């Protein structure tokens, strides 16, 4: 006589959990793709394949999410600026890194989304203005450190920044095959000594 074999219970799959940053990043992705009207708890949860209940582990409500999204974007921008200083020893390396960074589309998309949101939200407008000012000031410092006088440094910083923002907010971005060559030529143009 054989005894029936007991079937081992299949382990339950672990519940999917995502951290607060995943919610904020997805909110910015949705803001970019569909506008503020679609930045809703249900929409984000569906995109993340989570329940709405998981949202409340991280946020009180949608307003808390929107405030947190702006602050998260701002902090990421400030962290990027700080990271440049630690990853490059010379100002020319930092300038080159900023030019190269322009090509990173996800961050560009988040920047576009935040700029659009800033048109209707005071907190976002303050964050964008602060980040713009810090970016231009930082670039000015790099051009000063590269040997340019204050006016030249300021003009070059603004030219680079306007190029960077303009490239991803207009339909005039270069073809992928042209990007590397254009980035190199822009770098050489910006770090070339003035010809006065």
What residues fall within each predicted segment?
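N-terminal intrinsically disordered/low-complexity leader segments
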Residues: 1-18, 195-196
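Helix-turn-helix
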Residues: 22, 26, 30-64, 68
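Solvent-exposed, amphipathic alpha-helical segments
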Residues: 26-34, 80-84, 114, 163-167
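Hydrophobic/aromatic residues within well-ordered alpha-helical segments
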Residues: 62, 69, 73, 77, ...
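Hydrophobic alpha-helical connector segments
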Residues: 68, 79-112, 160
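Amphipathic alpha-helical packing segments from all-alpha helical-bundle domains
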Residues: 78, 107-112, 122-147, 151-158
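Amphipathic alpha-helical segments within well-ordered protein domains
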Residues: 82, 99, 115-116, 140-144
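Amphipathic C-terminal alpha-helical segment
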Residues: 113, 117, 160-177, 190-196
